[in-house]
Amino acid sequence: MKKIKQFVRDNEVVMQILSFIFNIPFMVKRYIKNIRRIPNIRCLGTFLWKVSINNFGKNNIIVIEKACRLRNCIINVYGDNNTIIIENDCELKGLNIWCSDGSKIFIKRNVHIVDSTHIASTEGKQIEIGERCLFASNTVIRNGDSQSILTLDGTRINYARDVVIGNHVWFGQNVTVLKGTQIGKDCIVGANSVLSGKCYSDNLLIVGNPGKVVKENVTWDPRVSR
């Protein structure tokens, strides 16, 4: 079975044929919506189950690369000149994407989302998620607040800022990552943690609200060691 899967992944034509066949019934039932309204969408070689893609603007680009598996996902794009790129071999379940006003979302290859994750990019800023990241359920990643916070003289103080997540980061359940946060590679973020506007280096265990480093020089493995 592993050899068959590897053959399919390595053969782009076979991947596209299989994904097209897989996706036909869901296109007919309109589980995949509004793709025709996005001329710059590419999702050949992907496997989509109950996926809704909604475009409310112009010049938006959505790329879902080969061997990606999306299930129960919603992608909403508002305004113009937005970019969403999901690289090869991602498995995303229950993902809700909001991208607006010339913003960008980059999800690198082999990212795994267990369920119910919300990613929102706004005000022309970007969110970047590195390779081989693992998200437990109910993760929230936002680079803006979607409303303005003002001083009494009318000065805004909560502009959106980029969020960057390095390769091979593991998020526990109910983690929230807010604007301006940068997380290095090989980090672990504990359940119910809130990270806001700080920069974290590589190989850290981060827990709490606000997120604090409780251990350094660590990494993680999806396999359970004995």
Residue ranges, per PLM feature:
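Flexible, glycine/small-residue-enriched loop-and-beta-strand segment within the central core
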Residues: 61-181, 198, 209-210, 216-218
